[in-house]
């Protein structure tokens, strides 16, 4: 899965907007949305919010966690443990879409960008460390990681698969050499 695919999936998350127009209910595959009344907050999928925002038909109301204070708490919590802290689902994708399409609707957008990047850096470092430890294990062939997001899985997936294949090839070569050495020793003894 690519970051773009993760962002596409995140587009189905529901978020509040303040529409700047009036419109009856919309009947979409994902469900009915509306009616829209100018100035009255309404919940819509993020992809609709972004589309309306691009056309300047609404302002997007940031989720409660997308503010400096809450992000600061998440960064501090993430720093305080080796385990992955619980973060909002699609935090990176939603923050990215806000900064890209609705920066004006996001108070302190520059500081928010810094805290989201800091949170990502801390979590990706943990992912890399966890992956290294996992790949260094001889006996175990599975791992459990709690509280990681889809984007983080996409980030680490390719390198884990590549490294696992390399380790498998090395193990195969090692076993072939070991069996060849043991057969060579039989000829010497006999």
Swiss-Prot record:
Keyword Nucleus: yes
Compartments, as annotated in UniProt: Nucleus
Domain of life: Eukaryota
UniProt key word Nucleus: yes
InterPro entries assigned: GINS_A (IPR021151), GINS_bundle-like_dom_sf (IPR036224), GINS_Psf2 (IPR007257), PSF2_N (IPR056784)
Pfam families (alphabetical): PSF2_N, Sld5
GO cellular component terms, semicolon-separated: GINS complex
GO BP terms, alphabetized: DNA replication; double-strand break repair via break-induced replication
Transmembrane segments: none
Keywords assigned: DNA replication, Nucleus
Primary location group: nucleus
Subunit structure: Component of the GINS complex which is a heterotetramer of gins1, gins2, gins3 and gins4.
Entry's family note: Belongs to the GINS2/PSF2 family.
Biological function: The GINS complex plays an essential role in the initiation of DNA replication.
The protein's name in its UniProt record: Probable DNA replication complex GINS protein PSF2
Organism this protein belongs to: Brugia malayi (Filarial nematode worm)
């Amino acid at each position: 899965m690519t970051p773009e695919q993760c962002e596409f999936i995140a587009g189905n998350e529901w978020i509040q907007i303040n529409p700047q127009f009036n419109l009856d209910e919309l009947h979409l595959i994902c469900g009915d949305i509306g009616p829209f009344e100018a100035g009255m907050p309404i919940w819509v999928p993020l992809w609709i919010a972004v589309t309306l925002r691009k056309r300047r038909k609404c302002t997007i109301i940031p989720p409660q966690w997308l503010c400096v204070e809450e992000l600061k708490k998440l960064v501090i919590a993430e720093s305080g443990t080796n385990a992955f802290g619980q973060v909002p689902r699609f935090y990176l994708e939603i923050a990215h879409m806000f900064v890209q399409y609705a920066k004006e609707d996001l108070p302190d957008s520059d500081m928010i960008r810094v805290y989201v990047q800091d949170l990502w850096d801390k979590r990706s470092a943990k992912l890399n460390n966890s992956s290294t430890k996992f790949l260094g294990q001889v006996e175990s062939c599975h791992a459990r990681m709690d509280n990681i997001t889809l984007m983080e899985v996409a980030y680490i997936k390719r390198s884990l698969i590549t490294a696992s294949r390399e380790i498998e090839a090395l193990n195969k070569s090692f076993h072939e050499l070991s069996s060849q050495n043991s057969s060579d020793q039989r000829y010497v003894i006999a």
